[in-house]
């Protein structure tokens, strides 16, 4: 009878009201790395790195790029005859140079500081081409016969459209020629000149005459003087001679003076920079140019994103994310995603004391599950969830600001220095990128660890808040759950959730129920002890009886001799 009562009471206790603290889980398979772990599955995360692109060139701020087509930068800017379609004023958002372009420097030679020139041209947005030194500037010399088969046009010999190859006339010696140009405008002027180096003395004498020859150029900020270097060289493009090509900038208010008595490749047409930008670019690519608009253009294509970083290309123009070498910069915003195991039931942790998250709780990160006579259900704790959301949002913005500060520091450092030093900065940029990439990855790993720890702490805090309210009015089940010693209807459950639980109100009922359960447990323990003693004694008597019976049987059939001595 006592055992039946115990079973009945325990069964009733199994249907007691309960409340559990838990956290959100979902079907996400997204994984992040932390400073201590790799491939941690989380409920929510944000990828800071863009890696998708549209493989085409578009307009930037409604301004089209300049397609050099079959010409190189050198061929266009010097005026290769095959690049006549590019003559005239030009404007662009950026310049596209094709890797297969063949029309560059036609008469063999080297353009001095070409990379710096490309950086300068890339920073321009609009240029006006004008005649700087008309042919009439140079008297007593031939300004029309300086052509070469190396620079053909319409099957005949020609020369660069922006340079003038000056040679002596057949009837007179090459006299000293002089020219001057004063930049009275407000824009800087890009101009070119060259020095011809014949392969032998015969060609030198034929073109310029015998004797020492020189080319001199000078402004308020530049001085140049060079004499021809006559030497035998291998043929390139059918020519054994060479031309050294030079360029410079004539600043507003400066005057360019030219003087030569031979071997001068004189400036003819020049470019006036009407509009410049510090964010220009020259892209070398075969991507098509299409009638489209973009805010971010890279050499690899268009980016359309609101992400902070990209790993598509370090060469870009427009409003683009910063480039890093990382494959991913995924920042955790949610919790570890550990959905509960069905066989373990509902009650069960993050933080070491709840075994799994709740996929049924969808309106918050942390919350409750209750069970009473009126039913059961989930409810999110909106206050702790909102605080966590705000904190993580601020964290994401803070990380972005920290990374942007790293990137912008060096740019500001070089912004007011000469272009040559700025170019050196670009060459060093790859090394800076390694450091920035490492810093970005390390920062994300550290913040991911902190985010998961934050969620852990928030669940624990919620658990401790409930525990401090219930005290001994509920039994701790040890898995994030509490079993009430009293009846707790929906109103009671709500008071626990919102922190207004009235402990004294339920104290007496809880105490009484707790004592009854403990009493039944003690009585049931006594019954079990009596049954255990009875069972032990009974088993011993049966065993002794069996031994005696076997002994008598063996004595009766002679298998064992029995002697009784008195």
UniProtKB/Swiss-Prot annotation:
Please provide the record's keywords in A-Z order.
Answer: Clathrin- and caveolin-independent endocytosis of virus by host, Clathrin-mediated endocytosis of virus by host, Disulfide bond, Fusion of virus membrane with host endosomal membrane, Fusion of virus membrane with host membrane, Glycoprotein, Hemagglutinin, Host cell membrane, Host membrane, Host-virus interaction, Lipoprotein, Membrane, Palmitate, Signal, Transmembrane, Transmembrane helix, Viral attachment to host cell, Viral envelope protein, Viral penetration into host cytoplasm, Virion, Virus endocytosis by host, Virus entry into host cell
Lipidation positions, renumbered (S-palmitoyl cysteine):
555, 562, 565
Q: What does this protein do?
A: Binds to sialic acid-containing receptors on the cell surface, bringing about the attachment of the virus particle to the cell. This attachment induces virion internalization of about two third of the virus particles through clathrin-dependent endocytosis and about one third through a clathrin- and caveolin-independent pathway. Plays a major role in the determination of host range restriction and virulence. Class I viral fusion protein.
* List of glycosylated residues: 26-27, 39, 182, 306, 498
Tell me if Transmembrane is a UniProt keyword of this record.
yes
Q: Where in the cell is it found?
A: Virion membrane; Host apical cell membrane
> What ranges are annotated Extracellular (topological domains)?
17-529
Entry's Gene Ontology molecular function annotations: host cell surface receptor binding
**SUPFAM superfamilies according to UniProt:** Influenza hemagglutinin (stalk), Viral protein domain
**One GO BP annotation of this record:** fusion of virus membrane with host plasma membrane
Further information in the entry reads: Major glycoprotein, comprises over 80% of the envelope proteins present in virus particle.
Q: Which family does it belong to?
A: Belongs to the influenza viruses hemagglutinin family.
Q: Which InterPro entries match?
A: Capsid_hemagglutn, Hemagglutn_HA1_a/b_dom_sf, Hemagglutn_influenz_A, Hemagglutn_influenz_A/B
| Regions that span the bilayer | 530-550
Q: Span of the secretion signal?
A: 1-16
Modification after translation, per record: Palmitoylated.
Spell out the protein name for this chain. Hemagglutinin
Q: Which residues lie on this side of the membrane: Cytoplasmic?
A: 551-566
Disulfide-bonded cysteine pairs: these are: 20-481, 58-292, 71-83, 106-151, 296-320, 488-492
Topology versus the membrane, per the UniProt entry? Single-pass type I membrane protein
| Naturally occurring in which organism (per UniProt) | Influenza A virus (strain A/Shearwater/Australia/1972 H6N5)
């Amino acid at each position: 009878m006592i055992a039946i009562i115990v079973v009945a009471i325990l069964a009733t206790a199994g249907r007691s009201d309960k409340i559990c603290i838990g956290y959100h889980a979902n079907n996400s398979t997204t994984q992040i790395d932390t400073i201590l772990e790799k491939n941690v599955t989380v409920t929510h995360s944000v990828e800071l790195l863009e890696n998708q692109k549209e493989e085409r060139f578009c307009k930037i701020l409604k301004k089209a790029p300049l397609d050099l087509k079959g010409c190189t930068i050198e061929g266009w800017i010097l005026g290769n005859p095959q690049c006549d379609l590019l003559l005239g004023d030009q404007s662009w958002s950026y310049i596209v140079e094709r890797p297969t372009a063949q029309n560059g420097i036609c008469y063999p030679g080297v353009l001095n500081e070409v990379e710096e020139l490309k950086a300068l041209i890339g920073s321009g947005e609009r240029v006006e081409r004008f005649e700087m030194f008309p042919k009439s500037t140079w008297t007593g010399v031939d300004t029309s016969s300086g052509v070469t088969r190396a620079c053909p046009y319409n099957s005949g010999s020609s020369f660069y459209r922006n340079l003038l190859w000056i040679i002596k006339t057949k009837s007179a010696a090459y006299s000293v020629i002089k020219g001057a140009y004063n930049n009275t405008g407000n824009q800087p002027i890009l101009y070119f000149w060259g020095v011809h180096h014949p392969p032998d003395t015969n060609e030198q004498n034929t073109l310029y005459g015998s004797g020492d020859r020189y080319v001199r150029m000078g402004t308020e900020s530049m001085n140049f003087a060079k004499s021809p270097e006559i030497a035998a060289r291998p043929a390139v493009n059918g020519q054994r001679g060479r031309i050294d090509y030079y360029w410079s900038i004539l600043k507003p208010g400066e005057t360019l003076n030219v003087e030569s008595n031979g071997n001068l490749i004189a400036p003819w047409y020049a470019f006036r920079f009407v509009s410049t930008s510090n964010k220009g670019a020259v892209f070398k690519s075969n991507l098509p140019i299409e009638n489209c608009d973009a805010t971010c253009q890279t050499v690899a294509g268009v980016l359309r994103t609101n992400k902070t970083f990209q790993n598509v290309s370090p060469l870009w123009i427009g409003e683009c994310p910063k480039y890093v070498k990382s494959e991913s910069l995924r920042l955790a915003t949610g919790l570890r995603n550990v959905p509960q195991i069905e066989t373990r039931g509902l009650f069960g942790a993050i933080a070491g004391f709840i075994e799994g998250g709740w996929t049924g709780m969808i309106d918050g990160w942390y919350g409750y599950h209750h069970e009473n006579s009126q039913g059961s259900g989930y409810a999110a704790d909106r206050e702790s969830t909102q605080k966590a959301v705000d904190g993580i949002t601020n964290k994401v913005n803070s990380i972005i600001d920290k990374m942007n500060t790293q990137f912008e520091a060096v740019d500001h450092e070089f912004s007011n220095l000469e272009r040559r030093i700025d170019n050196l900065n670009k060459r060093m940029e790859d090394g800076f990128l390694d450091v920035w990439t490492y810093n970005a990855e390390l920062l994300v790993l550290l913040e991911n660890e902190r985010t998961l720890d934050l969620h852990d702490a928030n669940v624990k805090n919620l658990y401790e808040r409930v525990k401090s309210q219930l005290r001994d009015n509920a039994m701790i089940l040890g898995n994030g759950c509490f079993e009430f010693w009293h009846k707790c209807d929906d109103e009671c459950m709500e008071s626990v959730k919102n922190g207004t639980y009235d402990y004294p109100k339920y104290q007496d009922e809880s105490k009484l129920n707790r004592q009854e359960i403990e009493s039944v447990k003690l009585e049931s323990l006594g019954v079990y002890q009596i049954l255990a003693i009875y069972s032990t004694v009974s088993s011993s008597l049966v065993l002794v009886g069996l031994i005696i019976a076997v002994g008598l049987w063996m004595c009766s059939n002679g298998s064992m001799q029995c002697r009784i001595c008195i």
